[in-house]
Amino acid sequence: TLPTQRFSRSDETDGPGTFFGGYRTIAEHYSHLDAIAANHPTLAKLVDYGDSWRKLNSKPNGYDLKAICITKIRPNSSDCALNPNVDKPRFLLMAAIHARELSTSEMAWRWIDYLIDNYNVDTEVTMLLDSTEVWVIPMVNPDGRQIVEQNNISPYLQRKNANTSQGNCQNPPGITYQHGVDLNR
């Protein structure tokens, strides 16, 4: 069982890189992934696994799609490689597939930190990371999330990505009228 932890968001709310009372922006999430990989090279590897719809179509505000692989990385191994032939089993957590699901990316952030901070501290975390690749994608839909982030007071209710190939809909997006493709259809 995981120990009970208390998290205080008082120092994080409405700070730089946040919106709507403390949710972190895409830029803040990507900076976090960069820092984890840079500060823990034997436990984490940042992977660019593709491009968002906007970036693929040369639209403004397009993003690289980023994942972080967390495991005890062995020298000269296939750990965290982008191929199916690896030695360790893999677990994949995808968060924020729908742009307006703000809390899922926050939970992914905390889980990444929990795994990194508790390696060689908690025996279960150590055993997990010694034997398994844990892949986390904290922001599956950055194009859609960027639309949500545009209104700091009350986030737009964009659910889909930012694909406009089917024509434009309501701007700002409402709960039922919005452009894009639902990524888990």
Which residues fall in each region the model found?
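M14 metallocarboxypeptidase catalytic domain recognition
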Residues: T1-R185
